[in-house]
């Protein structure tokens, strides 16, 4: 979020006042500068993976399995992180399973909730009426549920797929959290099950970073007496092989960023190359999207430095000049800029030129124009916030959110993310869809903006910052900070409901595109869960190491 300095001079002196943020430095030094891919190991993994994939594909399409067994197999494949190898087969199976599903089957809570979650994740609108049999005549949850730990855990995870108007799932969410927390504190759960429950309470499946959650689940699954060794072996090999690829990509990005040497010219900015790549890997981790990860990371880095320029260094007059330069998007505009801004502006133009050249080779350059326009729009909104800060203006919450849905980067990140997808998926129509300001992109932006406003509020206000959504809501409604936080989290939950609903069939665009918007939303849940983990990267350091450095023991 942007803010600017009160004025360009103090007491007539030429040196402007700058409310420096003093962001924490990069954690990584030269840790990711060099990496040599062990091609022999990579090929070894790959050869075994191909054999195992065919065995698992045969499992998925084999007939004769009961519906509950089939849905559980699909769930395990998803949670192990290997379902992307079998998307077509899984979708065909789910279409048949949903068409034949009968809620009068004698399914237990675990199985019903599992069906509900898997169907909803794939766009099938199963009614929450399927849970009615677990309520008594007074509408209360049956007491027997409290003793069914796996059922409670399954229902808890299912509640994250709720849409607006599903009050039952709100009640079920609160009920299962209370029961599971009580069980964890008691003596009756095994250590393995207790660990699984504690992790779920900390991070739900639906809102988690898919690759990190896969690694967690592998550690649980290998202790499961009913595990399938073929599935487990495939999951471990797949994670480790993909980790090698991601590590090599990160090394290229890290070296590119070091060679660009932008941070030495704008030392006030956050140096977050590794964290931006982590972010991009959440958007799409699959091996075929290596170009997309590089593109998205580079654009995120440029936006991060731009944000910090408006937020923690530039004077109002400097920022107005920079905003105009970005709108022109022409190298001649550089002559009007202060020296430190010239470096940033040059990097912006050069990186987009580089991205356009790379994508043109694959016939996908048409998305670059949309990304540029989204970048220009964000900068204009940053300037609006800079003006608000200069004037000491506290907007109404509605006025604030209208601007904040731009600065939340929803449109830019979605557009830039789409640029990395296959041309037959990210079509010109897909980019035009973004221009319609779809509910899902707005909801994703609202989640990121509001959770960031809550988590970074105290630190930003301490150094001097434009009024955030929290401040605007407190002033407009005359409520305390804590009361405003409660209301903002209600809005965040409603935004998640909107995302879930937009992913139900029939969808406006391909599910392959919508899943990227969902993944961008998931980042906010992971990175900003307890504090601003982007500004304070030590919060997500273990996630980065787990994803890019620590392989799974074979």
UniProtKB/Swiss-Prot annotation:
Mg(2+) 2 binds at residues 307, 311. Its EC number is 4.2.3.204. It catalyses: (2E,6E)-farnesyl diphosphate + H2O = valerianol + diphosphate. The keyword Lyase applies. Mg(2+) 3 binds at residues 452, 456, 460. It comes from the Eukaryota. Binds 3 Mg(2+) ions per subunit. GO terms for biological process: diterpenoid biosynthetic process; sesquiterpenoid biosynthetic process. A motif (DDXXD motif) lies at residues 326-330. The Asp-Asp-Xaa-Xaa-Asp/Glu (DDXXD/E) motif is important for the catalytic activity, presumably through binding to Mg(2+). This is Valerianol synthase TPS1B. The gene is TPS1B.
